[in-house]
């Protein structure tokens, strides 16, 4: 047996012994009738205590004679004979406990406290004071075991380092990694901030079906499920768009939804099959109004959540304070591939030759618009680091967007990029029912030709448009990618609490 294997075997034995010991301790608690009590009530969290009392001197705390009750997980413990220091962790952070044998009821210190383990959940009451080093602490007069942890915590110095284990056992990741906890707190703040921003602008939050008979609103491969009661195959939604626009037809002129979408596609640092989107629809507006809204939303969130409009992402500083750059798709191609002859982008054969010269495999079903879009994605997208709006998307790749009045080959659409990634997609909505019907037919033809991401024909949606959709603009923003930017995270799994994972065999 190699030394490495021997160490691994020893670790397994040590773990098994610890599990056995902890279960024996729980059995003893059960015999005493004190396992898992539920009558302890705290009155402060650690962050509340630090916010209110960190600025006070010990003399002030002694004069105030403040008694508090806290609860949380025991992360560290230093036993020094008749007294000990404990680090207690709760939702707000950490607070130090000073535990002295003679200040607790008889037997608690030696017979209970010293037998508890790291990871156990405790309740503590006592008076606030500051140590000689100035650390805010609680001098405990009551200490109780609220939950016995049967498994040990990850190594206290290194936390949970294995990346896959962090995703599979997110609870351990949250216990041991401050950075992960902060990421998901920021995510929650972003969601709350978006909702407040939207309500302030007169939008109503709604919910639309997660299971749909016809998946629409995006070009993607759907997940299929079966509804037993209806004996009907259904699809997990790839987007809520068509239902939200039905609501605008119905008279709800400003609606938004924050919820999950599902796309049966690959997993990468940018993609998770289940992801969160915010979609909004605004009557009597066009895509330019949504460019303004998007810019204002990101600037507001950065200022409110981070306290500044400059956001560090990797080795760059993203500036949400200055006006965002705006380029047409063709301008972006020219900027990042200067040798491009713009006239070649108007000719199918010339554009195809450019695409193939940069390694793009051109499918038979692609038209000129799709080829130009693929060229843009290949040569320009990764360079769009600072917030940038790309406009004038071809109609071929924008089946739900309104055609431009001057050039019907393009649409009144934009995509929003930060850090070389698409963050949002918005456009003036197509409200011509006959044009929409024809574009659905074009999508059906593309699907028949082998494009499994092409859209289905949605007859009911066309019928809704025939009743009249006001001039409307719509926008979708990827929440997960937004959170990645605001938390300096470089893989989408770091900002999703429970990302899709292959089961452990």
From Swiss-Prot:
Q: Which GO terms describe its biological process?
A: lysyl-tRNA aminoacylation; tRNA aminoacylation for protein translation
What keywords appear on the UniProt entry? Aminoacyl-tRNA synthetase, ATP-binding, Cytoplasm, Ligase, Magnesium, Metal-binding, Nucleotide-binding, Protein biosynthesis
Please list the reactions this protein catalyses. tRNA(Lys) + L-lysine + ATP = L-lysyl-tRNA(Lys) + AMP + diphosphate
As recorded in UniProt, its EC number(s) are 6.1.1.6
Gene Ontology cellular component terms for the protein in this record: cytoplasm; cytosol; membrane
Asked whether the keyword Hydrolase is assigned, the reply is no
Compartments where found: Cytoplasm
Which InterPro entries does the entry mention?
Aa-tRNA-synt_II, aa-tRNA-synth_II, aa-tRNA-synth_II/BPL/LPL, Lys-tRNA-ligase_II, Lys-tRNA-ligase_II_bac/euk, Lys-tRNA-ligase_II_N, Lys-tRNA-synth_II_C, NA-bd_OB-fold
By its UniProt entry, which PROSITE patterns does this protein fall under? AA_TRNA_LIGASE_II
Task: Please state the protein's primary subcellular location.
Answer: cytoplasm
Which parts of the sequence bind Mg(2+) 2? 422
* Organism domain of life: Bacteria
CDD domains hit by this protein: LysRS_core, LysRS_N
Q: How is the cofactor bound?
A: Binds 3 Mg(2+) ions per subunit.
Q: Which family does it belong to?
A: Belongs to the class-II aminoacyl-tRNA synthetase family.
Protein name per the record: Lysine--tRNA ligase
**Organism in which the protein naturally occurs:** Escherichia coli (strain K12)
């Amino acid at each position: 047996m190699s030394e490495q294997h021997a160490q691994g075997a020893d670790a397994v034995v040590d773990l098994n012994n610890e599990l056995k010991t902890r279960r024996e301790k729980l059995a003893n608690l059960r015999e005493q009738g004190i396992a898992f009590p539920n009558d302890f009530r705290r009155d402060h969290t650690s962050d509340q205590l630090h916010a209110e009392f960190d600025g006070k001197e010990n003399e002030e705390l002694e004069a105030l004679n403040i008694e508090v009750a806290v609860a949380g997980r025991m992360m560290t413990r230093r036993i020094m004979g008749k007294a000990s220091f404990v680090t207690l962790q709760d939702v707000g952070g950490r607070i130090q406990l000073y535990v002295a044998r003679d200040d607790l009821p008889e037997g608690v210190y030696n017979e209970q406290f010293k037998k508890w383990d790291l990871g156990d959940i405790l309740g503590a009451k006592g008076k606030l004071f500051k140590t000689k080093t100035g650390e805010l602490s609680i001098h405990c007069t009551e200490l109780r075991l609220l939950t016995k942890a049967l498994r040990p915590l990850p190594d206290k110095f290194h936390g949970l380092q294995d990346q896959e284990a962090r995703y599979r056992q997110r609870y351990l990741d949250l216990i041991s990694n401050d950075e992960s906890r902060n990421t998901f707190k920021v995510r929650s703040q972003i969601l709350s901030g978006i909702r407040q921003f939207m309500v302030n602008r007169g939008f109503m939050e709604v919910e639309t079906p997660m299971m749909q008979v016809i998946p629409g609103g995006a070009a993607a491969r759907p997940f299929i499920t079966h509804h037993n009661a209806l004996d009907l195959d259904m699809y997990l939604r790839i987007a809520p768009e068509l239902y939200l626009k039905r609501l605008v037809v119905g008279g709800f002129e400003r609606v938004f939804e924050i919820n999950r979408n599902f796309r049966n596609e690959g997993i990468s640092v940018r993609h998770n099959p289940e992801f969160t989107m915010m979609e909004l629809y605004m009557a009597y507006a066009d895509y330019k109004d949504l460019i303004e809204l998007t810019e204002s939303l990101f600037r507001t969130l950065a200022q409110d959540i981070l306290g500044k409009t400059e956001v560090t992402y990797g080795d760059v500083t993203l500036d949400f304070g200055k006006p965002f750059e705006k380029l047409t798709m063709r301008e972006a191609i020219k900027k990042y591939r200067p040798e491009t002859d713009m006239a070649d982008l108007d000719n199918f054969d010339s554009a195809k030759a450019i695409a193939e010269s940069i390694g793009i495999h051109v499918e038979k079903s692609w038209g000129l618009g799709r080829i130009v879009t693929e060229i843009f994605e290949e040569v320009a997208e990764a360079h769009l680091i600072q917030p940038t709006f790309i406009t004038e998307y071809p109609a071929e790749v924008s089946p739900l967007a309104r055609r431009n009045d001057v050039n019907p080959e393009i649409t009144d659409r934009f995509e929003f990029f930060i850090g070389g990634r698409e963050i949002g997609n918005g456009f003036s909505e197509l409200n011509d029912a006959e044009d929409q019907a024809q574009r659905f037919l074009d999508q059906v033809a593309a699907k028949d030709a082998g494009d499994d991401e092409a859209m289905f024909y949605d007859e009911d949606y066309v019928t809704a448009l025939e009743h009249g959709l006001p001039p409307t603009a719509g926008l979708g923003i990827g929440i997960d990618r937004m959170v990645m930017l605001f938390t300096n995270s470089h893989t989408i799994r770091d900002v999703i609490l429970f990302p899709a994972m292959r089961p452990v065999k």
